[in-house]
């Protein structure tokens, strides 16, 4: 397929976006943002209601996707229109001490934040009875409907792509009076389930017990040790026997030591190294080194350059797990106080565990799935007001692999995408107050 013709609508959207910005209204000052257009909730000044602050928001965006189902042949493209609304409710911010020269911010004894949107809901609660102890409780629900397989490959059946994820967590936090030392221990329960019956074999729950200890030294540096134990169970074992891929209950451990801080006024980094292991009821186990290096340079207050490397081992529906080695770079610019532009690029070298079907036969033409995944994008946002923004993004995503699935028949596979390329473009307007 020729991707040049697919890219034309994306370039047209980007050109229109840039042209509009050049003749835009007088700007409002843009706040700092991360590396990418976040089309989720954004917070403005809010409406005060007693001790609570209400933050409503609404976003309208249109986009083009050259490969909706991430297929390697006979791609399906589409224009997409999305309307998203949300409402956040929060207690007021931290209170400042009126006495002393430090004027440090002190958290309120009770802090609350909650929100509800079309595909996202959250509740965050913190109880701070003293400066040295806190209790934090939170629950987050996310729902995605992004297609991950072509319904025409399953006997023409139409079904929902809805994937629901809920995470409930509790943390106990203790710290020294000087706040040099801080320790955390907690528990979380994650539940992941699909709408469609054909994907019910992938439903699972994960119990986690995280713990961490941080030591702050110098004004802007910290050493952090973290440990996590996770136990994952698939809730429909009988359906796994009839599914196309082998899924296994497992226990996972990971431990790491990292440094985070600013070395100079312009240069900062996060560096860490650790160990991860996974023990599965069936097929491959894993153990190995995990690492992270994230460098950040700000040659000017309006320019931020980031580059880094990640080595991680993550759960996967194929082969139990995937070992990932990823390189990435981002650049963010603020122009005229209101226009934010950014670039992002990444490449990841991934390898799965032994990819098997439930009957023990190979899932594909090779024992292990190996991929090179590439991503790139250009994005921007223009603030007309402190609560009104125009945003746009053009992106590229690709997966290169020699792995091919064998003998799947009509059985639908979770996330089968392999050997694809996709261009997409988005343009939208959002109000957040």
Regions found by a protein language model. Name each.
Residues 12-26:
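Bacterial N-terminal signal peptides
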Residues 24-34:
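Boundary at the C-terminal end of the N-terminal hydrophobic targeting segment
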Residues 2, 19-20, 49:
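Residue-level detector of alpha-helical transmembrane segments in integral membrane proteins
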